Structures are given as structure tokens and as C-alpha cells.
């Protein structure tokens, strides 16, 4: 009894103690929430957290994080005001940087008072659980995980949300329209995902937004006009979204903006947006937005708080405003890659801030040496013969001495080292925000761009995570990186062909199961202005982080004395993992070696020395005679026909007529390889052994030599793997010559329609590759290049094939040389019957959709192996295209596939290509897709849903009459082609043993109005063709 008595007293004592501690109003977590929290942490694979009913009071949650490069942050907040302060409820859960694994537990939906979930920088997968729509959530932050799947539509049901922060994940698909229900939303941060499609119109309802970031996604459509509704917006980020311009005028309503970042827009050029009321602006980035205007004066007067200004890679002209002297707060200014003129203001030159003015057209250059300049002015002044201008300031970086180097080895971001027999130069300059450095006479680099959110980030990287294997070359352990643009230059290089090797290894992300492994680095690679890689991902191409990858280019031509390697960030990938400022281009090492035999340096024989002396004497004598003649002392002074070209900044190589005559054996007919609407083409071999193609243009161009050279310079800047490369030009007397790369396999027309001896019998994979190549080339001309070009004459004869049967478009930009005005209504039709879009052929209405139509015809020819203009299966069908529409209605499109292929082709790909061809040849230009979409369709990335054009829904009705008009158009158009042209076409089709000859319909002596007068009443039906065709029923 005594034992039981004492035990009872002990129990009572414990009870009294507990009551004394907690009282009658003990603030405890309900048992159901305790169990819910334990389940959540078990599923998050963190077993160390201690969850008790008393945890809200003693706050002993016992969080333990794995080793990580960033200090983790944890916080669980309770509200204990429920039921007269006797019950606690969890309201906020913050677990940042714990590398939590697994999925986001759906049990979060059982915490009925939870208003915040912050799981930033972990290693979570899966998607957002639907159960979250059951709770009054206000903040959802999951940036820096590996969450995936369609963007969660259930978020649109949580109308209490004020902050949605989901950057740097893997969400896909379009934004759900019901996000417009979140009228309390203040922050919507969804950058660096894989979101596609348009920004939904319903988001116009989000009038409380203060921060909207969607950069680094692959969106479509234009920047919506309704962003002007977001008048409370403080920050707007639209970097690298692939959206179309222009920036809408409604943006002027956003008077509270402090940060505006819009980059890499597609579409037409546009004026500078009206931002003058944004007086609180601190960071303004409008990079590559196709803006063609002077810089507004108000930037210097209204935006006095500006810290960062980036207007690079536009088409800005005029001078730098004097009002910029009032920008006392700025740290970074980027006006590079524009067309600015005039002298650089002295207050800019005296500034010690980061300023990049490279690649402009300034005058009055400074006298400082290249390495004394604090402002990056590389390649910003015309190439002139005045040697007082520093070489680094002049276009194309001409060699200040003899161009004698033939190799280059750089350990980017690392020390000098020797690998095998090669000595790699060190590259340790720590500057990079706006820097040009010519480390030696052999090479230099230019770096540009400020880091997002981390001005102090480094420009040199080391193998922080010890990823590089000891057996891997040492240069992979270091790297140079840049936030935006990184260029390396090989200087004073000999002319000729080189092999370029670029060495990469991702050394800034880890290879473990932590958030530090989740970074994605994407950038573009150009060599000599030619795009080699778009959205290049080092880790992906190498098969993991810390693994080496070599990108090699076997033939790179140096025609001047400079070789340029350009790595460029376009706003894609992540920029917060493992810390802010880890993104942008990165490279470990560069090697450049010659493809030609290099002089060994052995001493010259006496005979060779004597020959050199004699040759020098002869040359000097000739020079004296030339000077005497030009000054009038010998035969009088003659006017130099090309005097107006002196001092011009030629953006392309210059050839002499003597060089070209020697190369082509004086334009020997045996070397003639083709003839088109712009003149004959000859094969030639230069003295250094390089094979070229020379196009002999008509000398009747309406433009003067200066304008001609300007246009050619602009065309030569258009460089893409699927465009024929323009090496240069020659203008002497009446000769206008263009020098192109030589393509060994001639034209696509010859490969498909030539004689049995000439045809290449292309297999299906090659046809598919050729079709995609043409589409990529046109997409570049229309949407990606700075100079937007409509080709006007896309056809099989204007597509050439190299040794590997890669397609390259020729004659791009040449129709522009005969233009007098730049308007949508072209009075001079340049094209070929059977390939011209109806609105262009009949009305002269010219847009890039005319090229889309022509591409559709060529695509049809590639699949069928038949010429659109020569193949008529039945008398009532005018073109192959006409027959294709019939087969489409009958469901028999595959009958068009070239019988030579037999069964060796993909039916799925063939149907895809044929449907795309019909989609592109839609009579209505507005229903034809842009070429970038065509590329995606051909690659199977997006579905093809071509509209069906009904020909014979009512054989006696209007539809049949509309297609009958197409026959009248063909007959009328053929009557307009000169007898000479028809004779040439007849010759090309009947005699295929010689060079492939083709003619375009381009008659400069007759404009549209004259042609219409000559037609008279007999062709009234075809003049109404456009009106007829646009009424064709579309399903």
C-alpha cells in the first residue's frame, strides 16, 4: 500500500508540475498538425527535425542541413491566437538551401492555416501538389529546384496568393489563363523554365503586380499591350524570351518602374519607347530590341538615379546625348554594337566607370594607346589609312605591322602552361565588365556585361568542386566567363584557312544531388561571325559537369588579319545557381592551327635574295611611274573611276579584277558553272589555292559604286551555315563582281531534276536535312539577322549543296541592290514564275511571307523529286502544287513522294513535310507561318495543322473559278517574260550536260504599273486573282 500511495503522489506531482508550466491555456500544436508535419519532413528526407506539440513554444525544431556552399535558412512560424490562445497553428514554413529531396508532400494541404511555403534552393522534383488549393496560401517560393511538368493550373484557384516565385525549374507548357484570377498577386517570378506560348490575355487583370519576371523562357507572340495595366509594377524582366517586338507604347504607363529588362526581340525595327516618366529608373536594359533611333535626351534628364544602362546591339544612330553628363549614379553603361556617330564626349572618356562603346561609327578618335583606355572603344572607328588611329579602334582590327602569325594557344582564365609541345599563353586579367585587353601582339579579348544581382561576381573561374580528373589536361581546371559577351581575337594572322578548337568544361556546378548541380548555362558560339551553336550547353554536350568537350571547326577562313571567336549570352538558362552571377559564356582554352604549310624559317638562298631585290626595284620603278601619271607629269592626270570608294569602310574582302581574271582564266566559258537573273557565275581558283565562285553582275545597277559597296558590305555581314558565304567584291570600271565560296555539288535543282549523270539521287535523310537547312537559312534572314532580308527568289536553283550535301541559300540580298525605295509595295518584281506568292506576283506586295510561299514550293519539290513548273500530271493542273492540293483532299498525299525512294523513307516525316509545304503555300499570306515555326515543325517540336484549301467543293461554283484564275496568271506571266529569257529556259531544260542555267523573272525595264497597262482587258481575270484567292474557304 505504501508503494502504491507513494506512486500516486508522484503522478499527481507530475500533473501539478505540467499544469503549472502550461496552465489551463497551454499553447500546443494539435496532434493532427504534429503528425502532418512529421509526415512532411519524412517525405522531404530530413529525419533530423523534431516535431512535438510544444515546438511552437520552445522552437526546438532541430534543423540540420547537409554541407552546402550557402548557409541554409530555416523558420517555422506559428500563430497561437486560436481558441483563446490555447491552440497553435503553423502559418509559415521556410526551408531554404537544405538540399531537401523527394517531392513536395501533398500533406502541406492539411495545414489549414498555412500562408507561406518557402522551399527555395533544394533538390525537389515532381510538381506542385493540387492539395495546396485547399489552404489560404499567400506565398509560394520554390525557386532553384527540379520541379517539372506543365505549369500548375491549380495555382489559379488559390486566390489568396500574393507571391508566386518559381524561377529556375523545369516547368513546361503555356501559362494557364486562370492565373488571371489572382487579383491579389504582387510578385510573379517564373524565369528560367521551359514555358512556351503567349502570355495569356487574362493576366491583364493582375493590376496589383509589382514584380513580373519571365525571362529565359521560349515564348511566342508580341509583348502584350496590356502590360500598361500593371501601373504598380516596379520591376519587369523579359530577357531572352524570343518574343516579337516592338515594345508596346502602353509601357509608358509604368511610371513606378525601377528596373526594366527586355532583350533579344524578333520582328521589325521600332522607335525608342517612351520612358521619360520613369523617373525612379535604376536599371534599364533594352538590349537587341531592334530599336532604330537616336538615344533620347530624356535619359540623362529624367533618369538621374540610373545605375545600369544597356542599349547594346540595337540600331541606334546619332550622337551620345550631352545630357548623359547628369548621370552621376551610374556604374555600368553599354552602348556597344550600334551605329552611333560623332565624337565620344570627353566626360565619357574621363569616366572611371564601366563603359562599353565598341562597334560603333565614331569620329575624332582619342590618342591613347589601346591598353590605356578605360572605355571599351574597340572597332568603333572607320578603317582609314591614317595610321595615327590606334589599330584596336579601327574596324576589323587591322594588323599594325606584318600579319605573320599562323597559330594561337590560350589558356583562358589560367596560367601559362605547356601541353605536349604547345605553349599556352596565360589569361589572368580580372576585368570583364567592359574590357578590351590585347595581352600580346598575337591575341586579345573583349568582355562586356554586368552580372545580374551580383556586381562583384568574378570573370575568372576555377574548379571549385574538384570535378576535373587528374588525367584531364590542366587547362580544363580554369576558365574565363562573361555575363553577356566574350570575344577572343587572333591578331595579325596570315590569310588562309585554319582549324579552330574550343575547349569547354563546366566547372561552376556540382555533380551531386544538391541544388548546386541544377544550373543550366546556355550561350551562342560564333566564329568569324558565323553561328556555330545556338543555346550551347556545356554539361549537356559533354555528358555531365566536369567533363571536357571539344568543339572543333576544321576550316575557318581569315581573309584580313583577324580571327574572331564570339561567345554570347542571350538571356537563357539559370542565373541564381549556385549563387547569383553564375551564368553566361564560359571557355577553358583555345587553339588555332593552320591548314596550310607554314614557312619553316630556313635562311633564303642567294638566288632567292637576288630575285627579291630585283623584284623590289621593279616594283619601286612602277610605283614612281604611277605617281608621275596620276600627278599629271606623265600623260596627264586621269580621273579615278573608283575615287569615291576611297576611305569607305568595306565590311568585306576586296579583290582586284586582275586577281579574278587570273582565277577564272579570264572568264573562260569552260569555267562557267551557272547563270541566273543577276548574271553568269564562274568557278575560279585563287593564287593561294582557294576555290571560289564569281558572280558577274550587270553593270546597269541604278546605284552608284558607294551605295553598291555599302549594300554588299551589309550582305556580307549575313553569315549563317545555311547561307552561301560572300568573301568579297570587285569594282573596276564597269565590272561589278561578287566572290563567293564554291559549293562542290552545284544546285539543288541539278541534284533533283538534272540529267541521269548530274542527279545525285538524294536519299530521304538527306532530303530532310536539306529542307531543314533551307528553313533555317530563311529563318535567319527573316528573324535572326540584324539586317532583315526578304530573298524574293527562293527556288531549287538558288539552293546550293556543299560536299556534305548541306543546303546553302544563294543570291540573298541581291534583289535589294536594284531597289529604289524600301516599301512593302515593290514596283520591280524579282522572282520566278511558279515560285512567286500570288500577292507579290499580282500586286507587288512584298513581305517575308513571300519567301515562305516559295519555300513551300521547294519543299514540295524536294519530297517529290519533280519540278513545280515542268511537271503536269494532267492537262487541267498547272503546277505540281495544284496537283498536291487535289491529293490532299483525296487523302493521298504520299503519292507525291519521289518513286526513286521506293520504300526507303519515313512516311511520318514525308507527311509532315508535305503538310508543311501546303501550309506555307496558303493563298493568304497571313495564314502562312513564320520560318522559325517552320523549322520547329520540320524538327517535330511543334505539331503541323495545315488549313485545307477546298478546290472543288462546288465544281461549278466560285472555288473552281478561283483556281482557274491561277492558270490565267501563269499564262499572263509567261507572256511578260522576254523571248531571251524563254530561250534561256528552253536551253537549260533541253541541254543538261553543261552548267546548270536558270533565269528569274526580273525585268527592270518594266514596273508593275506598265505591266498592268500592257495586259489590257484580256487578263482582267488574273488581275483579280488575289481577291479571288483570299476568298478560298479555309477549314
Curated annotation (Swiss-Prot):
Domain Protein kinase: 667-948
Location, primary (coarse class): membrane
Catalysis performed (reactions): L-seryl-[protein] + ATP = O-phospho-L-seryl-[protein] + ADP + H(+); L-threonyl-[protein] + ATP = O-phospho-L-threonyl-[protein] + ADP + H(+)
Keywords: ATP-binding, Cell membrane, Glycoprotein, Kinase, Leucine-rich repeat, Membrane, Nucleotide-binding, Phosphoprotein, Receptor, Repeat, Serine/threonine-protein kinase, Signal, Transferase, Transmembrane, Transmembrane helix
Localisation: Cell membrane
LRR repeat placement: 87-110, 111-135, 137-158, 160-182, 183-206, 208-232, 234-254, 278-302, 303-326, 328-349, 350-372
Group of enzyme by EC: transferase
Residues the record lists as Phosphoserine modifications: 826
Disulfide cross-links: none
Residue positions where Phosphothreonine is found in the record: 656, 827, 832
Glycosylation (residues): 46, 75, 83, 110, 194, 208, 229, 256, 277, 317, 337, 361, 386, 469, 559
Family listed: Belongs to the protein kinase superfamily. Ser/Thr protein kinase family.
Name under which the protein is recorded: Probable LRR receptor-like serine/threonine-protein kinase At1g53440
Taxonomic source organism: Arabidopsis thaliana (Mouse-ear cress)
Taxonomic placement: Eukaryota, Viridiplantae, Streptophyta, Embryophyta, Tracheophyta
Amino acid at each position: 500500500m505504501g508503494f502504491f500511495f507513494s506512486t500516486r503522489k508522484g503522478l499527481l506531482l507530475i500533473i501539478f508540475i505540467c499544469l503549472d508550466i502550461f496552465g489551463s491555456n497551454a499553447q500546443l500544436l494539435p496532434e493532427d498538425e504534429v503528425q502532418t508535419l512529421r509526415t512532411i519532413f519524412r517525405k522531404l528526407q530530413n529525419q533530423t527535425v523534431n516535431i512535438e506539440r510544444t515546438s511552437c513554444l520552445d522552437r526546438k525544431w532541430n534543423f540540420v542541413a547537409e554541407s552546402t556552399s550557402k548557409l541554409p535558412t530555416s523558420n517555422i512560424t506559428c500563430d497561437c491566437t486560436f481558441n483563446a490562445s490555447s491552440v497553435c497553428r503553423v502559418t509559415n514554413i521556410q526551408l531554404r538551401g537544405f538540399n531537401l529531396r523527394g517531392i513536395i508532400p501533398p500533406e502541406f494541404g492539411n495545414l489549414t492555416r498555412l500562408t507561406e511555403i518557402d522551399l527555395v534552393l533544394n533538390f525537389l522534383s515532381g510538381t506542385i501538389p493540387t492539395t495546396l488549393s485547399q489552404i489560404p496560401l499567400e506565398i509560394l517560393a520554390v525557386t532553384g529546384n527540379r520541379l517539372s511538368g506543365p505549369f500548375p493550373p491549380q495555382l489559379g484557384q488559390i486566390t489568396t496568393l500574393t507571391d508566386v516565385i518559381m524561377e529556375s525549374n523545369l516547368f513546361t507548357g503555356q501559362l494557364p489563363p486562370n492565373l488571371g484570377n489572382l487579383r491579389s498577386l504582387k510578385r510573379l517570378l517564373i524565369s528560367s523554365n521551359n514555358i512556351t506560348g503567349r502570355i495569356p490575355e487574362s493576366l491583364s487583370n493582375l493590376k496589383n503586380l509589382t514584380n513580373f519576371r519571365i525571362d529565359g523562357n521560349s515564348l511566342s507572340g508580341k509583348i502584350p499591350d496590356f502590360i500598361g495595366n500593371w501601373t504598380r509594377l516596379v520591376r519587369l524582366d523579359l530577357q531572352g524570351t524570343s518574343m516579337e517586338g516592338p515594345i508596346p507604347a502602353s509601357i509608358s504607363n509604368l511610371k513606378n518602374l525601377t528596373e526594366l529588362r527586355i532583350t533579344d526581340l524578333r520582328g521589325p525595327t521600332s522607335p525608342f519607347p517612351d520612358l521619360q516618366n520613369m523617373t525612379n529608373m535604376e536599371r534599364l536594359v533594352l538590349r537587341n530590341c531592334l530599336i532604330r533611333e537616336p538615344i533620347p535626351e530624356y535619359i540623362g534628364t529624367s533618369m538621374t538615379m540610373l545605375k545600369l544602362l544597356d542599349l547594346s546591339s540595337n540600331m541606334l544612330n546619332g550622337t551620345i546625348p550631352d545630357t548623359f553628363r547628369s548621370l552621376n549614379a551610374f556604374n555600368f553603361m553599354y552602348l556597344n554594337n550600334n551605329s552611333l556617330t560623332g565624337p565620344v564626349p570627353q566626360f565619357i572618356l574621363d569616366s572611371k566607370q564601366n563603359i562599353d562603346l565598341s562597334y560603333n561609327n565614331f569620329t575624332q578618335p582619342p590618342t591613347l594607346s589601346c591598353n590605356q583606355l578605360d572605355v571599351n572603344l574597340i572597332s568603333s572607328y572607320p578603317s582609314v589609312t591614317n595610321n595615327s588611329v590606334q589599330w584596336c579602334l579601327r574596324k576589323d582590327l587591322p594588323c599594325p605591322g606584318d600579319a605573320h602569325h599562323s597559330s594561337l594557344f590560350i589558356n583562358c582564365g589560367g596560367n601559362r602552361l605547356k601541353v605536349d609541345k604547345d605553349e599556352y599563353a596565360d589569361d589572368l586579367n580580372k576585368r570583364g565588365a567592359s574590357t578590351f585587353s590585347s595581352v600580346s601582339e598575337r591575341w586579345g579579348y573583349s568582355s562586356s556585361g554586368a552580372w545580374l544581382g551580383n556586381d562583384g561576381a568574378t570573370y575568372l573561374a576555377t574548379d571549385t568542386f574538384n570535378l576535373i580528373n587528374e588525367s584531364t589536361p590542366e587547362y580544363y581546371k580554369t576558365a574565363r566567363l562573361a555575363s553577356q559577351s566574350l570575344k577572343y581575337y587572333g591578331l595579325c594572322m596570315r590569310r588562309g584557312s585554319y582549324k579552330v578548337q574550343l575547349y569547354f568544361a563546366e566547372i561552376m556546378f556540382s555533380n551531386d544531388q544538391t541544388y548546386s548541380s541544377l544550373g543550366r548555362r546556355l550561350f551562342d558560339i560564333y566564329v568569324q561571325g558565323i553561328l556555330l551553336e545556338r543555346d550551347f550547353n556545356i554539361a549537356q554536350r559533354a555528358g555531365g559537369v566536369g567533363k571536357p568537350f571539344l568543339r572543333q571547326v576544321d576550316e575557318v577562313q581569315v581573309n584580313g588579319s583577324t580571327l574572331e571567336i564570339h561567345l554570347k549570352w542571350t538571356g537563357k538558362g539559370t542565373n541564381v545557381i549556385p549563387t547569383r552571377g553564375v551564368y553566361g559564356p564560359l571557355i577553358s582554352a583555345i587553339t588555332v592551327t593552320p591548314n596550310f604549310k607554314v614557312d619553316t624559317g630556313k635562311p633564303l638562298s642567294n638566288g632567292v635574295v637576288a630575285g627579291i631585290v630585283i623584284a623590289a626595284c621593279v616594283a619601286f620603278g612602277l610605283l614612281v611611274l604611277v605617281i608621275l601619271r596620276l600627278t599629271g607629269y606623265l600623260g596627264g592626270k586621269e580621273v579615278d573611276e573608283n575615287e569615291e570608294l576611297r576611305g569607305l569602310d568595306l565590311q568585306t574582302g576586296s579583290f582586284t579584277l586582275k586577281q579574278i581574271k587570273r582565277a577564272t582564266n579570264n572568264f573562260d566559258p569552260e569555267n562557267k558553272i551557272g547563270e541566273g537573273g543577276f548574271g553568269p557565275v564562274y568557278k575560279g581558283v585563287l593564287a593561294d589555292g582557294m576555290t571560289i565562285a564569281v558572280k558577274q553582275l550587270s553593270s546597269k545597277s541604278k546605284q552608284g559604286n558607294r551605295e553598291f559597296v555599302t549594300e554588299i558590305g551589309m550582305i556580307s555581314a549575313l553569315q549563317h551555315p545555311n547561307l552561301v558565304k560572300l568573301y568579297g567584291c570587285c569594282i573596276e570600271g564597269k565590272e561589278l563582281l561578287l566572290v563567293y565560296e564554291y559549293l562542290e555539288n552545284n544546285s539543288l535543282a541539278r541534284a533533283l531534276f538534272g540529267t541521269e549523270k548530274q542527279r545525285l539521287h538524294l536519299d530521304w535523310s538527306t532530303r530532310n536535312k536539306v529542307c531543314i537547312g533551307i528553313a533555317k537559312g530563311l529563318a535567319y534572314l527573316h528573324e535572326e539577322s540584324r539586317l532583315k532580308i526578304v530573298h524574293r527568289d527562293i527556288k531549287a536553283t538558288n539552293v546550293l549543296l556543299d560536299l556534305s550535301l548541306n543546303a546553302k541559300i544563294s543570291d540573298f540580298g541581291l534583289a535589294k541592290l536594284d531597289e529604289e525605295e524600301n516599301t512593302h509595295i515593290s514596283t520591280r518584281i524579282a522572282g520566278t514564275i511558279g515560285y512567286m506568292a500570288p500577292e507579290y506576283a499580282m500586286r507587288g506586295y512584298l513581305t517575308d511571307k513571300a519567301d515562305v510561299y516559295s519555300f513551300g514550293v521547294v519543299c514540295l519539290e524536294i519530297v517529290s523529286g519533280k519540278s513545280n513548273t515542268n511537271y503536269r500530271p494532267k492537262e487541267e493542273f498547272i503546277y505540281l502544287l495544284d496537283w498536291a492540293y487535289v491529293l490532299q483532299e483525296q487523302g493521298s498525299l504520299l503519292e507525291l513522294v519521289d518513286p526513286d525512294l521506293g520504300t526507303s523513307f519515313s512516311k511520318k516525316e514525308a507527311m509532315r513535310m508535305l503538310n508543311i509545304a501546303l501550309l506555307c503555300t496558303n493563298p493568304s499570306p497571313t495564314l502562312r507561318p513564320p520560318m522559325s515555326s517552320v523549322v520547329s515543325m520540320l524538327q517535330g517540336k511543334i505539331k503541323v495543322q495545315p488549313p485545307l484549301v477546298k478546290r472543288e467543293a462546288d465544281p461549278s461554283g466560285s472555288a473552281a473559278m478561283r483556281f482557274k484564275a491561277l492558270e490565267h496568271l501563269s499564262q499572263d506571266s509567261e507572256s511578260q517574260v522576254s523571248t531571251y529569257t524563254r530561250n534561256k529556259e528552253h536551253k537549260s531544260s533541253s541541254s543538261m550536260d553543261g552548267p546548270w542555267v536558270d533565269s528569274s523573272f526580273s525585268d527592270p525595264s518594266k514596273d508593275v504599273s506598265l505591266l498592268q497597262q500592257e495586259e489590257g482587258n484580256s487578263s482582267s481575270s488574273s488581275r483579280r486573282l488575289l481577291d479571288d484567292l483570299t476568298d478560298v474557304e479555309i477549314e
